[in-house]
């Protein structure tokens, strides 16, 4: 297939790494995506690279390996993975489907699902790492079921595609988003809103959350007691099921473990408090009030989730 006309010129200025070493390539990608397996068809000879930026909780990037490569993710962890090809092609197994992916057809893999892709040697991927909690808040369903097949040229997706190209091609826009977390958050929500508008969740998933009752009980318990020093055993007792059953259900229906859900809940509450807090209130106090006892880890987790530091959130509000 010939390369798509989608050329993300602005992203090229955000080169995360270049490497001919397989282990380094895997480790550098894992830092911004998640741990995964890379299986080259032979000895890796080409140069791999990744361009990557964050817009709030949305990650946008390109990945090329320079060689034919198989990428395996056991379970997409807490986000939706959207991928199509800028050049080359891929065969992807995801969401119970086998798909041919290129510049016109993309794949959207839900949290908790396995992702297995075989990429041609000339393949350069365009990837979006879309925070599952944000999709849940915008759709009203924390486990929204989105069709895994994405027809990039569909008229319904034209507004999303045009906005995505604008962001990826505009150095000035990316620079402004990097400098102003509020702009980044607005772009994040606009891109996700346009995607959902043009590629809506299945009607059944919008009407009914298929998660079992014990998982909903666990969520209600976490939402009511997130500020307390909860352990996994506390959530298991509230759900009244074995730990393995609860863990498997969270991974299947929420795309994350129970403790990851607890951390995400604490982070969401912390962000809301930081946005509404009085100027004299310390960030450390907000973190402690939301159940975080290690302030350094809180700051790292906050930036990973929202693409900005707690102090930057406070600065935008002021």
Curated annotation (Swiss-Prot):
Consequence of gene loss (knockout): Cells lacking this gene are unable to grow on anthranilate.
Pfam family, one: AraC_binding_2
SMART domains, A to Z: HTH_ARAC
PROSITE patterns: HTH_ARAC_FAMILY_1, HTH_ARAC_FAMILY_2
GO molecular function term, any single one: DNA-binding transcription factor activity
UniProt GO BP: catabolic process
Keyword flag Transcription regulation: yes
Domain (HTH araC/xylS-type) ranges: 216-316
DNA-binding feature ranges: 233-254, 283-306
Alphabetical keyword list: Activator, Aromatic hydrocarbons catabolism, DNA-binding, Transcription, Transcription regulation
Entries under InterPro entries matching the protein: AndR (IPR049668), AraC-bd_2 (IPR035418), AraC_XylS_family_regulators (IPR050204), Homeodomain-like_sf (IPR009057), HTH_AraC (IPR018060), HTH_AraC-typ_CS (IPR018062)
Function: Involved in anthranilate degradation through activation of expression of the anthranilate 1,2-dioxygenase subunits.
Designated name of the protein: Anthranilate 1,2-dioxygenase regulatory protein
